[in-house]
């Protein structure tokens, strides 16, 4: 019995030292401001409350106010029980804790997805869609409902804040990956990290990417699931340890790759990246494929200085 107790204490001490060695794990406690939010919203929004309660944010005591706080004068800020908050959590907000990830994302084509809305491609699509029967205060001339609930949900919308401070329903809710936010930032972290659980397992799942990478003009999801990679994933997905904080192919799993495995996730030789272009050696979107550094140069992105050979090596490694 004494030996069991000693071993247990040693295990606890070892775990404690391990946590301490990893550095800060979050806030010491839920803030008073967030506690005030939770007091009401645990009953008003029980689903959101439960999702947050199962998240790593919960374990780090990062709650409502830490993400939704705003300041008087910001475009989408409104006063709520004496505090200024915003409904939209933009990459600028996430950068308070996740600066490296946001910087990488901002350098990627993902974050620029909303720029297509002003392009000739998009104008052509709007003409083809035709019906502009979805009229809102921000768009009295109307929009095609198929664009609002289709194209914009992947590429992102340009969020419009109405005169009364509310968000135009044609542009919000929206989690498009290239959303243009009221604070001027581009992108939406929740395109991949679905609120409010922000599950790593969910973000790594092929269906997460397949929400947008599917269909006749970008059929990556269909190609993946019909490939040996997709067949293996379907057979062994319960054995891939997709919820682990550390998720390195060849160490934590080996039976099948997901989209994230090759394009984003950590390997034995390189860290996670949120710039998906750093492992792609061709840009196949144009009618004639181009090297990614060419496309990056046109968009003014840092990747213009990263040759395709380096990106190919990143993918191989």
Question: Residue spans of the language-model regions?
Answer:
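Bacterial N-terminal signal peptides
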Residues: 7-16
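Primarily the internal scaffold of c-type cytochrome electron-transfer domains
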Residues: 23-24, 47-62, 76-144, 157-317
């Amino acid at each position: 019995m004494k030996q069991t107790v000693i071993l247990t204490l040693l295990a606890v001490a070892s775990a404690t030292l391990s946590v301490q060695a990893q550095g800060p794990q979050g806030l010491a406690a839920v803030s008073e401001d967030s506690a005030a939010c939770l007091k009401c919203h645990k009953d008003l929004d029980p689903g959101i409350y439960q999702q947050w309660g199962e998240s790593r944010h919960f374990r780090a005591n990062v709650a409502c106010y830490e993400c939704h706080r705003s300041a008087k004068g910001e475009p989408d800020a409104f006063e709520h029980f004496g505090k200024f908050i915003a409904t939209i959590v933009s990459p600028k907000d996430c950068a308070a804790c996740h600066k490296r990830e946001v910087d990488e994302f901002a350098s990627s084509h993902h974050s620029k997805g909303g720029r297509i809305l002003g392009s000739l491609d998009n104008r052509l699509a709007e003409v083809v869609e035709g019906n502009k029967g979805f009229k809102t205060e921000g768009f009295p001339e109307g929009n095609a409902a198929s664009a609002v609930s289709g194209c914009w949900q992947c590429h992102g919308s340009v969020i419009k804040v109405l005169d009364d401070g509310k968000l135009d329903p044609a542009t919000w809710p929206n989690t498009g990956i290239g959303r243009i936010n009221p604070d001027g930032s581009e992108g939406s972290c929740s395109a991949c990290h679905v609120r409010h659980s922000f599950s790593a397992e969910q973000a790594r799942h092929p269906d997460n990417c397949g929400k947008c990478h599917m269909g006749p003009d970008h059929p990556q999801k269909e190609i993946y699931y019909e490939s040996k990679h997709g067949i293996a994933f379907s057979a062994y997905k319960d054995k891939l340890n997709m919820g682990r904080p550390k998720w390195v192919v060849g160490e934590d799993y080996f039976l099948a790759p997901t989209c994230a495995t090759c394009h984003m996730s950590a390997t034995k030789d390189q860290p996670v990246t949120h710039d998906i272009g750093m492992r792609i050696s061709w840009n196949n979107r144009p009618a004639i494929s181009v090297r990614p550094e060419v496309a990056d140069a046109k968009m003014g992105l840092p990747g213009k200085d990263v040759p395709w050979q380096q990106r190919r090596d990143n993918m191989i490694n």
